[in-house]
Regions:
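Conserved N-terminal alpha-helix of the aminotransferase class I/II PLP-enzyme fold
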Residues: 1-85, 93, 106-120, 125, ...
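Conserved PLP-enzyme active-site core in the AAT-like
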Residues: 76-180
């Protein structure tokens, strides 16, 4: 229950917490990607940030173009300040859509990707030493699947899962797929 305080009108927030909560705050800062850039922080603190320079028009254009490309509405397109921010947001959304459901990560993950899942999205099972039909069996067995996460290619092994093989099992369970 650390206090959150708005700083100015630039959508920048400061979290002040006791040293007891510092490890949790640091883990959030380190793994989620939801942090302000040093350039934005400097401009905000000095009062030199221009609201028109915050990119609202550019974000609207990007949302509109992505929505048209994927045949969805612009409201369905979520933009994040960083790749890790997007991974955090996708995992959080998966947890809200399928609370308590099983989560699986296929192939070797980037450390922070796995940490986001473990720390902020619940328990996740990591499978790296199997492939193809074995992945299908892992997905099909057990509790209903909430989300499957993978990286293409995996880092550092540069492997890619066989989506043609696993997607029918994921769809059958109603699970979400998150691909980085």
């Amino acid at each position: 229950n650390a206090p959150v305080e708005a700083f100015g009108s630039c959508d920048v927030h400061i979290v002040i917490c006791s040293s007891d909560h510092a490890p949790t705050a640091k883990a959030f800062w380190q793994h989620t990607g939801l942090v302000v850039s040093s350039r934005r922080a400097r401009s905000t603190l000095s009062g030199t940030i221009n609201q028109d320079d915050l990119g609202a028009d550019a974000r609207r254009t990007i949302r509109d173009r992505l929505a048209a490309f994927y045949s969805v509405t612009a409201g369905d397109v979520l933009l994040f300040p960083s790749g890790m921010g997007a991974i955090f947001g996708a995992n959080r959304l998966a947890s809200e859509i399928h609370p308590g459901r099983r989560r699986v990560h296929l192939e070797f993950p980037f450390l922070d990707t796995l940490k986001v899942q473990q720390e902020f999205a619940g328990d996740v099972s990591l499978y790296t030493a199997v492939g193809g039909d074995d992945f299908v069996q892992l997905i099909s067995a057990g509790e209903p699947l909430g989300a499957l996460m993978t990286e293409i290619p995996s880092n550092p092994l540069l492997k890619t899962i066989d989506f043609d093989k696993i997607m029918p099992a994921v769809r059958h369970q109603g699970g979400l797929v998150i691909v980085d």
